[in-house]
Amino acid sequence: MAHKKGVGSSKNGRESESKRLGVKIFGGQAAIAGNIIVRQRGTAHRPGDNVYAGKDHTLHARVDGLVKFTKKKDDKSYVSIEPFEA
């Protein structure tokens, strides 16, 4: 026999706020130095040429240019920036 009623509505209904992760500037799009390219947990995408990672693994553009996503032989995704011609 149950010793508690099966209601419990006040103990339910909690969920964490979404963290808005993901790619913010896609391949072929222009990025300005300092722009966020990818927000991520861990290193799903790794920094390539002219891209640096913040302490929370967010990838930022180091220079103005076009974003490029590539996969190398190790099957990992790399994000790089091809600078605009001066």
Swiss-Prot record:
Instruction: Could you list this entry's UniProt keywords, alphabetically sorted.
Output: Ribonucleoprotein, Ribosomal protein
Per the UniProt entry, what are the Gene Ontology biological process annotations, in alphabetical order?
translation
| One GO location term (cellular component) | cytosolic large ribosomal subunit
List each coiled-coil range.
none
Q: Indicate yes or no for the key word Ribonucleoprotein.
A: yes
Any one Gene Ontology MF annotation carried by this entry is: structural constituent of ribosome
Q: Which Pfam families match?
A: Ribosomal_L27
* InterPro entries the UniProt entry points to: Ribosomal_bL27 (IPR001684), Ribosomal_bL27_CS (IPR018261)
Its family?
Belongs to the bacterial ribosomal protein bL27 family.
Official protein name in the record: Large ribosomal subunit protein bL27
